[in-house]
A protein has these predicted regions:
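Walker A/P-loop phosphate-binding motif and the immediately C-terminal alpha-helix
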Residues: 2-38
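Inter-motif core of Ras-like GTPase G domains
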Residues: 124-133, 148-167
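Conserved beta-strand segments of the P-loop GTPase G domain that flank and frequently precede/overlap
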Residues: 103, 161-164, 190-193
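Conserved nucleotide-binding/hydrolysis micro-motifs of P-loop NTPases
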Residues: 38-39, 107-109, 143-144, 166-168, ...
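Switch II (G3) loop of P-loop NTPases
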Residues: 104-110, 114-115, 126-148
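N-terminal phosphate/diphosphate-binding loop that engages ATP/GTP or pyrophosphate donors
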Residues: 23-97
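Conserved catalytic network of the ASCE P-loop NTPase/AAA+ motor domain
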Residues: 24, 93-94, 128-132, 153-154, ...
């Protein structure tokens, strides 16, 4: 199972990504969670302490590693476009509650779409992750898909956009769907988070095609408490976990 979970900051995509990761890990699956968000907080959501998170150096910031694998240095402007990265998930991931966390970091490719060694490195790692045959791979990503090439995107089992019940959030889904289509992805799914009432749910169901909507997660103060304390939502909110478990059941049926 290969999942890319995206959405604007604050909508709850990391709550979904971390909870799915822990649900799969509890089943005994091998789970690798990749944090590809500039505001990296997947580690906290999985159960790491703030001190442990602060000690992690993102792959994109490991200059020596990037130079070693790509051949790029200050004196050498030429570098490999397909560096060897197959060993990186095992070497540089951190185990937490049965999940291997790989903090990727991000690279600002700029408006011109320029490519640097760090960007090539991240794209190569993401591509390699999609070929881990029997593993569950969950990518927690920002709303842009800059680090996904056509081959990587087409290997994903599910693209999931987390939204809130609002017009701007729905527009994010539409933007991601357009970008994903350009990469050869046939379907983009949606999870609506922070749904407070029937009116919110009706808005979501009116804005999102039924075949794209995986489900809703209702607004839950327990999730807010977990975030304030820097704890994993998995350990705080049985209601939210049950709702995400129902979403997982749909994903499992489609995997099989």
């Amino acid at each position: 199972m290969k999942l890319a979970i995206t959405g604007k900051g604050g909508v709850g995509k990391t709550t979904l990504a971390s909870t799915l990761a822990r649900l799969y890990a509890d089943e005994g699956r091998t789970v690798l969670a990749a944090d590809v968000d500039p505001d990296a907080n997947l580690g906290l959501a999985l159960g790491l302490s703030q001190e442990e998170v602060d000690a992690i150096v993102p792959i994109s910031k490991m200059r020596t590693l990037v130079e070693e694998r790509t051949g790029a240095t200050d004196a050498n402007r030429f570098y490999k476009l397909n560096p060897y990265v197959a060993d990186i998930p095992e070497k540089y991931s951190k185990d937490i509650n049965g999940v291997k966390l790989l903090v990727m970091g991000t690279v600002d490719v700029g408006g011109s779409g320029c490519v640097c060694p760090e960007h090539v490195m991240l794209k190569s790692i993401l591509s390699a992750l999609t070929y881990r045959k029997n593993d569950v791979v969950i990518m927690d990503m920002e709303a842009g898909l800059e680090h996904l090439g056509r081959g990587t995107a087409s290997n994903m089992d599910q693209f999931i956009v987390v939204i809130e019940p609002g017009a701007r959030s729905v527009q994010t889904y539409r933007n991601v769907k357009r970008l994903a289509k350009d990469l050869g992805v046939k379907q983009v799914r949606v999870v609506a988070n922070k749904v407070r009432n029937e009116s919110d749910e009706a808005f979501v169901r009116g804005a999102i095609p039924a075949e794209d909507l995986l489900g809703c997660i209702h607004y839950n103060p327990d999730i807010i408490d977990a975030d304030r304390q820097g704890k994993s939502p998995y350990d705080f909110s049985p209601q939210a976990i049950d709702e995400i478990r129902q979403i997982k059941a749909i994903l499992d049926r489609e995997e099989n």
